[in-house]
Amino acid sequence: MSIFAIADAHLSFGTDKPMDSFPGWNDYVGRIEKNWNKLVTDDDTVVIAGDISWAMDFDRLVADFEFINNLKGKKIILKGNHDYWWNTAKKMNEFIDQHGFYTIKILSNNSYSVENISICGSRGWLFDINDEHDEKVLNREVGRLKMSLDSAECDEKIVFLHYPPITTDSKCDEILDLLTIRIIKKTKL
């Protein structure tokens, strides 16, 4: 059993917003499918850390989730900044059940145990100290990450965020402080 991660797939089977119009994205869906199914087994778990689909609603999301559901492994998905279709966990789980997307689980204020590891996470946020809206969003995301960590049942935890808390030119102390308090170790990839 292995745990993999990917983000920013920006699938668009149900909407007209193909990413392969950008340099380096040519046939990206085919490359994702080929490499995913070459590396991932049905016993593995793949965390999809946001920006999953360009869909604006569940109706346009169906084809993207069909694609994801048909890939090997179990999938745990969390929200990215472009997941406009994202809704309450209850509504998303109803959507998943209605369409039989049983390999997909929603990571939202919760965690999942994979073997002896708890998978935790939230979207996170890049914080601009001068923007009141950013402060509200950041506080909400820190709260969501706390709920995810609080729900973890295993001693070992892996945290996934759509927005990395450290970039080349900034860091998000609020998220980093929470991870430090909870003794989440940095892993080299």
Annotate the PLM regions.
Residues 2-8:
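Short, hydrophobic/glycine-enriched beta-strand segments
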Residues 6, 49, 79, 120-123:
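Short glycine-rich loop/turn motifs that provide flexible caps or phosphate-binding loops at active sites
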Residues 9-16, 87-180:
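Conserved catalytic scaffold of divalent metal-dependent phosphoesterases
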Residues 2, 15-114, 172-186:
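Core catalytic region of metal-dependent phosphoesterases/phosphodiesterases
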